Amino acid sequence: MSIIIGIDHGYYAIKTAHCSFPAGLTSYGEHEPYTRQGLLEFGGCFFVCGSGRQPIQRDKTANDNYYLLTLAAIAKEIQQRGLPPECSVRIAAGLPLTSFGRDKPKFREYLLRSNQPVNFKFEGVEYSITIEEVAVFPQGYAALMTETGLLQDEPSMLLMDLGGWTVDLMRIDNAIPAADTAHSLELGMIRCVDDIREQVRRETGLSLTDAQIENMLAGQPCTVSDTVRDIVNKQGRKYTEHLLSATMEAGFDLHAIPAVLLGGGASVVSRHLSPKDALCKTIFLLDDKVNAVGFERALAAVSRRKSEA
């Protein structure tokens, strides 16, 4: 029996139903690195997964980076579920609606390769994984399968998936995606973090790490001065204002339509909204793994329908 593993291949992070790690990948060639944490051995080479951030790669199939990160994600999820390292897997993945039809066949082929099973070692454990199937679903909309009541309560709503590089927008009418309204803004969390880092450097001369900025944006502990923390919070509010403005300019009236916000950037917006924004209604799905969970439920539902047919 095969298991379903949902994977959200973000620019900023890779998420499964139970795991989340940065979408960074460092190659060490044939030389074993100093650490076992995140260490992937594949094809005679060593890679460390989850280290930092890789350059923006608009075509995720352009090289093997996202395939290698997929193997790491499978290993992490299998370990988290307590499953054997030799098993069959069905991958449930996702793409933005703006590029869904164009990129779906290519992305599916990229993940579903002919050489099966896939043999690799992750963090010292040997895996032999047979990838039986790759199903691709629309990002954001699939996540709503985790909160089905949201689709029943409103005739129209705006879905805002705040990812690493883009914010994907789509209106949903009577629980059906209005595909012709799909719009993508290059205002994801990478842009937000980079702008904050530059502003802090400009005002204080200090160079913050991504992890420091992310912690402060989330309201978590970080040893910095009050001056730096104030700059980060002001920039978080500025980012939120910019995002709301760009969404309105894209033709979505946030004063008239409820919005569901999800993805890694949703927590930032939730902390920096103000009553003066006068939004109609905002619903936050703050678990950054919600897309991966939605992909799994979508594939399970498809499989059920096939078995009942």
Language-model features: locations:
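Nucleotide/phosphate-binding catalytic cleft detector across ATP-hydrolyzing
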Residues: M1-M157, I176-R191, E203, D210-A309
